[in-house]
Amino acid sequence: MLRLALSTHAETFERIREPLVDRGIEIGHLQAKQRAIRLTDRESVDRFDVGFVFPGRLMEGTAINALHGLPWVNNREDVLTSRNKGGVIAALHAADIPVPETVMVSNPVSESVVIKAAGELSFPVIVKPNSATRGIGVAKATDMDSLLGIVDYLNLVHDYRATGDKSYLIQEYLPDARDYRVMVVDGECVGGVERRLPEELAEGRWKHNVHRGAEATGIEVPAEHRRLAEGVAKALGISYLGVDLLETDRRLVVNETNARPTVDAATKYDDDFYGRLAELIKRTAADT
């Protein structure tokens, strides 16, 4: 039986274990963080045939990958590509894929640069760290004073020498937008969810991240949304991808992507989700 390494032991591990075992793939946990990694002992490492998604901790992941020598369904380059929100926006725009109007700011810059960048948009605007996930650090600025206040905090973080990514995005705000996560496996949309805040949490809030209390409800993904998500995966060259879409009455745009998406309940995906995922894993292992 093929052995698949997962660097996560959370929801995705538990949800995909049995469906993949039924398709000839055994899953094991390849721990990449909160441990001591012996770098000079390859003999004692667990044996795997293929990795699922490269560890989010890139430094530890690179060391572990050297010890195990694995092919990955989504490799280090895929994770880096998707994590770079500004790079994704630029690449998709170049591919004629609709995205929000966005300016990337690379610190350190003067206040006048921020004012000029925001002047190209209209308030309110969204401010987000370029590399963070789960909606962490994302804020809405309703005017120039609030924007500059948010930027002050980002500047404090970016002043720390160990901060790797010293960039952030200023992005147009799409009011009352519906928020979708569409999954693409091996170039084909395999289902998706709409993310909504429950009624008791919705008052005065606009973020729809599941990690911030939103609920993900399975939907029949419309044809236009499917084509758009598939086009995103093709443009970025990533085989297993979560594509975040925002839809208003007039527009459908790609907001972000995730090359390390959490797998939701099977009922929220198309019937062939696990079949396609298993075939992708097996082909990745065979291509080495």
Feature locations, PLM:
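Protein kinase-like catalytic core scaffold
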Residues: 125, 191, 253-256
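Active-site nucleotide/adenylate-binding loops and adjacent lid/helix of ATP-dependent enzymes
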Residues: 69, 81-168
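Phosphate-binding site of ATP-dependent enzymes
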Residues: 142-228, 232
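Extreme N-terminal starter segment of soluble prokaryotic enzymes
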Residues: 1-4
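Conserved N-proximal alpha/beta basic substrate-recognition cap immediately N-terminal to
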Residues: 6-104
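Structural detector of well-ordered beta-strand residues that form the stable sheet scaffold
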Residues: 28, 73-74, 100, 126, ...
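A long amphipathic alpha-helix within ATP-dependent nucleotide-binding catalytic cores
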Residues: 203-251, 276-287
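Glycine-rich phosphate/pyrophosphate-binding beta-alpha loops
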Residues: 258-269
